[in-house]
Amino acid sequence: MTTTTKPKAAYWIIAVIAFIWNVMGVMAYLAQAYMTDEAKQLLPEAERTLYDNVPAWATAAFALAVFGGLLGALSLLLRKKIANLLFTVSLVGIIVQMSYNFFISNSIEVYGPGGMIMPIMILVLGIFLFMYSKSATTKGWLN
């Protein structure tokens, strides 16, 4: 039997925010993965070309990032140690996806420097949630 300690209020706030954030990520993934041709036609041509040329491995990385993050956040809410593994999977997905966006595709040309703000924020939050879940495990908050 393992011993756990009770987490502070900040833990629950972070876990709820992480859950909401990752629900939004799943919604963004589903919107992109299942975007209809009619919806794509409403995009500027450069954006439409970006969407049409995303390789399957980058889409898979996006899916791993958001679904791993959602399950990790749910695990935080349930105080389960698997949260750290799930946030690790999510972070790997984020890194792979962002590597494609920054270094392989021409998304920076299409969206401009301002288009880097959200991806950088996603990466920072992914690192934070990975480190936070590891810390929560060390502190005995997760079982």
Explain the meaning of each model-derived region:
Residues M1-N143:
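Topology signature of small-to-medium multi-pass alpha-helical membrane proteins
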